[in-house]
Amino acid sequence: MMAARRINSAGLVLIQSFEGLRLTAYRCPAGVWTIGYGHTGPDVNPGQRITPAEAEALLRGDLDRFESGVAAAVGNAPTTDNQFAAMVSLAFNIGLGAL
């Protein structure tokens, strides 16, 4: 069995730069409570604060779903690590269903 394909460090930095780091929860333009590098969900509450390390852990956890989804969509098609990272970044931004 092949190991799960993961985003490379350049892709991680790309997502972090696009999302920006917010250590205090805020409402995004869509009205959703958000923290860290674009993390949303029932675990984000008004006034919540996190550390940079916690923000990175949340992002890595969030990316699991997108890495798996992109890997499934790509299948055996040859892609470079940077191409895969770009697709994960896009999926993180617009959602897997929009790919």
What annotation goes with each model-predicted range?
Residues 1-99:
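Cell-wall polysaccharide-cleaving catalytic domain and substrate-binding groove, primarily
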